[in-house]
Amino acid sequence: MASWLPETLFETVGQGPPPSKDYYQLLVTRSQVIFRWWKISLRSEYRSTKPGEAKETHEDFLENSHLQGQTALIFGARILDYVINLCKGKFDFLERLSDDLLLTIISYLDLEDIARLCQTSHRFAKLCMSDKLWEQIVQSTCDTITPDVRALAEDTGWRQLFFTNKLQLQRQLRKRKQKYGNLREKQP
């Protein structure tokens, strides 16, 4: 199942804790953890310092407490936990799916589940609030969508349209027809 994973599983960059200005990169591939650093200093004795790199297999990284400590210090405990899980083979396959595929999957969820999923990450929040998702949900729950309703959804948003009750929807459609009808009459 992991064969369709990209070669680079995770990559992040960061700056060392103050007062250090050193720059760091953490790269996790399918087989290795690569930790790179660049010394940034105004002092002349450090100007000729070359960048460094430490490469460890996943198994070696799990046993290397020094490199884990550096990772936690620079990138934080959450990143360290995530990298450890990647090294143990615990991949987040759901996060790696395309947006279109995720939108199709999410459209089959109950509304309560969509609300919970929206709270899990920035990416899922963006997907759960997207007009594309709510258009799919409206299309699956409604028999037909008239051009007037589609135009109203383009103006107000599909999510807003979904949560609007029928009486309010009829009122909004009437107002929209009057507004655009008056505009057409005024045009020569």
UniProtKB/Swiss-Prot annotation:
Superkingdom: Eukaryota
Stretches assigned to the F-box domain: 91-137
InterPro entries for this protein: F-box-like_dom_sf (IPR036047), F-box_dom (IPR001810), SCF_F-box/WD-repeat (IPR052301)
Keywords: Ubl conjugation pathway
Subunit description: Directly interacts with SKP1 and CUL1.
PANTHER family: DACTYLIN (PTHR14381), F-BOX_WD REPEAT-CONTAINING PROTEIN 4 (PTHR14381:SF1)
Protein name: F-box only protein 36
Species for this entry: Homo sapiens (Human)
